[in-house]
Amino acid sequence: MTNIRKTHPLVKIINNTFIDLPTPSNISSWWNFGSLLGLCLIMQILTGLFLAMHYTPDTTTAFSSVTHICRDVNYGWLIRYLHANGASMFFICLYAHVGRALYYGSYTFQETWNIGILLLFTLMATAFVGYVLPWGQMSFWGATVITNLLSAIPYIGSTLVEWIWGGFSVDKATLTRFFAFHFILPFIILTLAIIHLLFLHETGSNNPTGIPSDTDKIPFHPYYTIKDTLGALILILTSLTLTLFTPDLLGDPDNYTPANPLNTPAHIKPEWYFLFAYAILRSIPNKLGGVLALLLSILVLAFIPMLHTSKQRSMMFRPFSQLLFWMLVADFLTLTWIGGQPVEHPYMLLGQLASILYFLLILVLMPTASLIENKLLKW
């Protein structure tokens, strides 16, 4: 009798995805982040569901309801901080996942890569609307500043902003719709993640060498299930350590002050995972230019497959490209740091230089280095 996992219509899908999936034998721990992102998503949906049971999306009670969750709900404080810090873990895994794809040339899987970019945008939208929900000072002013950027769009800008606000300022209507968006978007992310996986399994995984590994595949289970379990345990341990010892480490103290439209915080800044894009936005003294640069800071990923000039797929054997890649990582971290600093000298100048370098590395220097490497190898 044939094994049920290979014949049953539903179990067969799970089998072909997580059990009998042929996987390259040499993929490193950098390939763990895909499954970790899946784990983060499940954790966020579950903690979010329990938070939604006690949260009220109304300007008069939103802040109080979050306080109520922390003080009066059984383990409410734990659920709330797991959810808040879970977002940070999500983005850490996400940036590592994208970084790995850039380093090893996984972006040549065109469909998988494009769905990934769509996932990144959806995730950023989810995190942004979620940050507005506690209705603290930074929630309110963050929502005001970021939604206001749309007014830079010629002709329809102002109408668009008022349409998103549901009035003439960020108010009750805005909070209610942001809660609705924050509830629905994770399920859209889940759907996109399944499509992402579907496209990946059409081609099979890449590996550190970038060379096709059809001749050397091993089953996903038990080899990579055990490897992913280790990654998952490290993620859970890190998440719990952060939540139980320093729950407010990555948050903003201003968000413990209820939203007040009459009092602007000294430094309006988003959560740490958006600071790099925020630094790029602030580097350009023109509103529309800043918005376009902000959009392009993520959208530039879509051009990377077209800018792949190397004859090799991975950066494993390309020292010049490796050097530029780590420069990009350092630049990303510099932008993140500058995004959290006040708009004054020397941060403004540093931010502008780091922003120019960011686009220069991706669009010019890396493709040029690849061509030089080809030349040196007489290819």
From Swiss-Prot:
Question: Which residues are listed as membrane-spanning?
Answer: 33-53, 77-98, 113-133, 178-198, 226-246, 288-308, 320-340, 347-367
What cofactor does this one take? heme b
The UniProt GO MF terms for this protein read:
metal ion binding; ubiquinol-cytochrome-c reductase activity
Cell location: Mitochondrion inner membrane
Q: Which GO terms describe its cellular component?
A: mitochondrial inner membrane; respiratory chain complex III
Any one Gene Ontology BP term: mitochondrial electron transport, ubiquinol to cytochrome c
Which Gene3D superfamilies does UniProt cross-reference here? Cytochrome Bc1 Complex, Chain C
**InterPro entries, from UniProt?**
Cyt_b/b6_C, Cyt_b/b6_C_sf, Cyt_b/b6_N, Cytb/b6-like_sf, Cytochrome_b, Cytochrome_b_C_euk/bac, Cytochrome_b_N_euk/bac, Di-haem_cyt_TM
For this UniProt record, give its keywords in alphabetical order, as a comma-separated list: Electron transport, Heme, Iron, Membrane, Metal-binding, Mitochondrion, Mitochondrion inner membrane, Respiratory chain, Transmembrane, Transmembrane helix, Transport, Ubiquinone
- Chief location bin: mitochondrion
Q: Which residues bind heme b b566?
A: H97, H196
Q: Which residues bind heme b b562?
A: H83, H182
Note describing how the cofactor binds: Binds 2 heme b groups non-covalently.
* Pfam families cross-referenced by the UniProt entry: Cytochrom_B_C, Cytochrome_B
Family, similarity comment: Belongs to the cytochrome b family.
What does the further note read? Answer: Heme 1 (or BL or b562) is low-potential and absorbs at about 562 nm, and heme 2 (or BH or b566) is high-potential and absorbs at about 566 nm.
Purpose: Component of the ubiquinol-cytochrome c reductase complex (complex III or cytochrome b-c1 complex) that is part of the mitochondrial respiratory chain. The b-c1 complex mediates electron transfer from ubiquinol to cytochrome c. Contributes to the generation of a proton gradient across the mitochondrial membrane that is then used for ATP synthesis.
Q: What is this protein called?
A: Cytochrome b
Gene (UniProt): MT-CYB
